[in-house]
Every structure is written in C-alpha cells, then in structure tokens.
Amino acid sequence: MEGDTIRIGHLSTMYHTAFLLRGSALLAERNISATWALYPSGPDIIAAMQAGKLDLGYIGLPPVIIGIDRGLDLACIAGGHVEGTVIVAGSDTPTLAECGSMGEFLKQFAGKTLGTPPKGSIHDVILRELLREHKRADVAVKNYPWADFLSDAISTGEIAAAAGTPALAATAHRYGNGRLAVPPDRLWPFNPSYGIVVMREMLEKKGLLARFLSAHEAACEWIRHDPAACADIVARTTGMVDPAFVLETYRISPKYCAALPPEYIASTMKFVRTLHVLGYISRQVREDEIFDLAGIRSIHPGPHHYMAGICGT
C-alpha cells in the first residue's frame, strides 16, 4: 500500500472534518496515519506548505489563490463547507435585519473599526469586498492573528463588529458579549469557506488521497446525519468546548459536503476577480490552476449536499 502518512495542517474551526478525523477511527480504518498541526489562519497554513512542512491543509480558498499567484503548486481536491463567514456585533448594534439593507447596516460603522482574522483569509476578503462594494472607505479593518481574539475585541470596544466563523457567533451567544448581526447566507452565496488542499506533488499518491477523501466524505456525511454524535467527538478531541457549543456552531451554517460542484467553483472564481481588484494577487489565476476534480468525482459522483442541511435543523 502507498505511503501511509499525511502531514496535515488545520485550523481551530471545529466544523471542519479535521477534529472528527482526529477523534475517530475513520483514518485508521483506511490504513492512514496523520500528523496534525494547528495554525492560526489559512495564510499561515499556506506559508507552512510553502516551507515544505505540510502535505495537505484545511483552508478557505482565497489564501490558496494567493499562494498559487505567488508560485506555490497547490490543488484543491475536495470541498467541505460553504458559507462559513458571519458578522458579529455588540448586543446593542442593530442587525442587518433591523437595518433593512446592507448599505444601512454598514453605514452605522462610519468612523469605526471592524475586525477579521489575518489579511488574505476568506473572512478578511469578504469583509473588505463588502466595504468596497458599498463604498465605505470610512470604515477601518483590523486584522487579528487568531480568530479567537475577535470576541474579546468586541467586548472591550476595540472593534465595533467582526467577520469570522460561526463559532464567533456561538461564542457571542453563549457569553452574551455580542450577537449574530449578519447570517452566513447574506454575505457571499456559496462561498468556499474551506476545501481540502494539497501540494500538487501529492496528486501522484492517488491511492492514499483516495482513502483520505473517502474518510473526509464519510465525516461530512456523519456531520449531516448525526451532528450530535459528531459534536461529542469534536468536543472531546479539542478539550476546549462542550458538545452543545459544537452543535450550535454546526447549525449556524449547516452546509456540509465534500463535493466540488459548479456552484462552489464559480464562487471561487468570483474570489479570483475580487482578489485581483483588491490587489491581493497580480493576475487572474485560472480554474485549472486551483482545482483537481478527479479524486472527489470518483468518491462523490452524485449531486452535492451543501443545501440539504443537517438533521435537527
């Protein structure tokens, strides 16, 4: 059997399948061993891949596009989740629904600062494009090295609101220091919140990647069909949150699947144009430079499940 160990970089994002694969037998059942390394952000994973430290990463697609533009030979070989960015604000801040339009919602932040994870992360790009689209040059953006810092920054008034993962909204709800101001489906339709990305030299290990993708697909389906059991495993694996917190995070944006359908790819290519306009990349990176579809089409040949939701929602 082909080389059995994969060096994997992942984030603290608990709805990624990384924690589920770490805490279950899904990889071992497929004769795969993995070394896991936690990173603060997608751009940090890209830097580690560039340094030769990783074979595979769990990453939002904008950092991948930026890495390819800089000469890194990467390929997105599977999806995982879409629409994983929310905006959270202080409890007294009017929400998008209360404001009635995105323009009115953003207007209230004139002269204030909004927070996001590091520059080049998917949350950073979505927020900056939103401000550009609505001509809000009077709103500043502050990037934080870890997404985990955003909740405290809202509490202290350092920032007025933040763009981040659904866990940010779950934290705000649990501790009462903020609330969900813009839900994930109102920001960027079908945005590729994360995919499975490898160095292209890994594509030669077809058997190993096929077994990994089989495990990843099984984990995505597990989240969809038994989120409570998955939440128990993830909570135990992280050792930092309880199952109820994980379950709430799952439900804020319940759009899980391993497939790479046309909608996922089209949304990614929209990011290419946005990244170019924002000056993050020097050229229009091509679709075939970003994606390698052969493996996941073999593992998941049918229709995608991103819009099918999860049990209990």
Where does each model-flagged region fall?
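Pocket-lining segment of extracytoplasmic ligand-binding domains
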Residues: F149-R236
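Secondary-structure end/capping motifs
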Residues: K205-S282
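Short, solvent-exposed loop/beta-turn-alpha elements that line the ligand-binding surface or hinge
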Residues: E29, L96, R186-L187, K255-Y264
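Short, glycine-/small- and polar/acidic-enriched structural segments
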Residues: E2-E129, E133-H134, A160-P166, A181, ...
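Short, hydrophobic alpha-helical packing/hinge segments within bilobed ligand-binding/sensory domains
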Residues: D44-I46, V64, F149-A153, A169, ...
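Conserved C-terminal helix/tail region of periplasmic/extracytoplasmic solute-binding proteins
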Residues: L275-T313
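Helix N-cap/coil-helix junction residues
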Residues: I32, L72, R136, M240-V241, ...
